[in-house]
Curated annotation (Swiss-Prot):
GO molecular function: hormone activity; neuropeptide hormone activity; prolactin receptor binding; prolactin-releasing peptide receptor binding
Cellular compartments annotated: Secreted
Pfam families named in the record: Prolactin_RP (PF15172)
Source species, domain of life: Eukaryota
Protein keywords: Amidation, Cleavage on pair of basic residues, Hormone, Secreted, Signal
Secreted as UniProt keyword: yes
Prosegment location in residue numbers: 57-83
Major site of localization recorded for this protein: secreted
Tissue expression profile of the protein: Widely expressed, with highest levels in medulla oblongata and hypothalamus.
Protein name (record): Prolactin-releasing peptide
Any one GO BP annotation for this protein: eating behavior
Functional summary from the UniProt entry: Stimulates prolactin (PRL) release and regulates the expression of prolactin through its receptor GPR10. May stimulate lactotrophs directly to secrete PRL.
Amino acid sequence: MALKTWLLCLLLLSLVLPGASSRAHQHSMETRTPDINPAWYTGRGIRPVGRFGRRRATPRDVTGLGQLSCLPLDGRTKFSQRG
């Protein structure tokens, strides 16, 4: 009988704990300061990744895009020393 009571308590506890953690997460989302301006960070060398998202790569950030080539991997390829 004590084992059944113990298992019932564990079951009830497992049902209660996920609800408490989700409420805590929602609460932390509500306490953000709404007056933060992402434009303030522009030109200052600061990248706030967590709040405003990751920076997307632009074509000017990618160097050597036209220099990519495919080389065969059969071992018979002679590489030029000219670079």
